[in-house]
Amino acid sequence: MIQSTRISMGLFFKYFLSLTKIDPGQNYISLPSIKSSTHIALLFMVSMGTQKLKAQSFFIFSLLLTLILFCITTLYNENTNVKLIPQMNYLMVVVALFFLNAVIFLFMLMKYFTNKQILPTLILSLAFLSGLIYLVETIVIIHKPINGSTLIQTKSNDVSIFYIFRQLSFICLTSLALFCYGKDNILDNNKKKTGILLLALIPFLVFPLLAHNLSSYNADYSLYVVDYCPDNHTATWGINYTKILVCLWAFLLFFIIMRTRLASELWPLIALLCLASLCCNLLLLTLDEYNYTIWYISRGIEVSSKLFVVSFLIYNIFQELQLSSKLAVHDVLTNIYNRRYFFNSVESLLSRPVVKDFCVMLVDINQFKRINAQWGHRVGDKVLVSIVDIIQQSIRPDDILARLEGEVFGLLFTELNSAQAKIIAERMRKNVELLTGFSNRYDVPEQMTISIGTVFSTGDTRNISLVMTEADKALREAKSEGGNKVIIHHI
């Protein structure tokens, strides 16, 4: 077990280092690019497509990934001659964060509109929307031309202020969403719901206004987070602010785990973002001097984590669409096709330019209403599922089996003759009678039988109404003769 774990981790490190670019001349390491991070996210999506991950295992793996990123960046940045990253590169990172936050906001908002009972989802969407405000402010600051050391210090200080308040807004709104998690009484009370939303406006609107006024836009109330040294062209980061952020992220991560137990699909993603932000700020604590390289690395961690969140949300949407498509044409109880799909299939067959031999069967479970009345609907459902399983074992894989209503099923067969249709129908009838007999493996209370009405056509008819009418006549004829029979009509 230990050896296999070492091999797996070795392969992971080998893949990660192949994506990581090290410049020997500059002696520093940069995180994987956005494209490489997408490769990692896609690998996760493929693995999730093959097996359904539990929330706990998903979070543990994300924890290991983020810690590995943190250790690698810290290791390669010790005692290095750090150089400034070009301003345009940093602008690209901020723009990437802007679009990632916008995408996550839209996903969260759409998820809320699909189920307006989930108030925490709406509050979380506001958390990502608030980040867009700070990122717009940051982009405007970066675009300002540099005319001396004073403006460099001002730009660095403003970027730091918006960075701090962006995290504070996210922490406050996430904490409020966490407070509402699992409290249905808030949703039932409109006054409480309105109060919660008004409270959410403080970090959503008041914090950005406060950050704007504490920046260089208002000289009377400026907050100085960064001290610029013109001699060596470095800016010293206020470490106390980082310590506060580290504590807040750590407490938020702890309470998310304790409150939600990572039970839903959404909260493990939020926990991952908290963990990434925690590591970003811890990375800043490990260095004595503020510089754009380390800032760029921390933003790279945030980009990677949010790329993964976006990838998972897209994967989740495709899963829900797949489930919705399946429910649209499948019966919930028996997991076979429903009436709508069956009739569409028959109409599609009859509308072909050339229609070959085909057969439609209607199957009715004899004495099913008595089973429901005597044993209850729970046993009745078990009988339905059992007979469906027996019928599926008696027909070909490409044949269509659908539940039309109650205990009536429809089957559509193609590429067979009348004799083959009779053989299949008799096989179904005998198997149901035999496999539901005494001490059967399906645990149905008594032996069951079915009646089958069959209509066979050589392809001359194109009228679905005629086909279904003849099949229904054959079924009623089989039941009128005592049931447990197969009657075939030809058209």
From Swiss-Prot:
Protein's recorded name: Probable diguanylate cyclase CdgI
Query: Looking at its record, which EC class is this enzyme?
Result: transferase
Molecular function GO terms recorded: diguanylate cyclase activity; GTP binding; metal ion binding
**Keyword hit for Glycoprotein:** no
Record has Membrane as a keyword: yes
Assembly: Homodimer.
Site entry: Transition state stabilizer: K369
Q: What happens when the gene is disrupted?
A: Deletion of the gene increases swimming motility and early biofilm formation.
What upregulates this protein?
Induced by 0.3M NaCl in an RpoS-dependent fashion.
Report the transmembrane regions from the record.
55-75, 90-110, 122-142, 159-179, 194-214, 237-257, 266-286, 294-314
Residues in the Periplasmic compartment per record? 76-89, 143-158, 215-236, 287-293
- State where substrate binds: N372, H377, D381, R427
- Give the encoding gene's name: cdgI
Q: Which residues form the active site?
A: E407 (proton acceptor)
Pfam families per record: GGDEF, MASE4
Q: Which reaction does it catalyse?
A: 2 GTP = 3',3'-c-di-GMP + 2 diphosphate
The cofactor named in the record is: Mg(2+)
Pathway listed: Purine metabolism; 3',5'-cyclic di-GMP biosynthesis
Stated EC number for the protein is 2.7.7.65
Q: Which PROSITE patterns match?
A: GGDEF
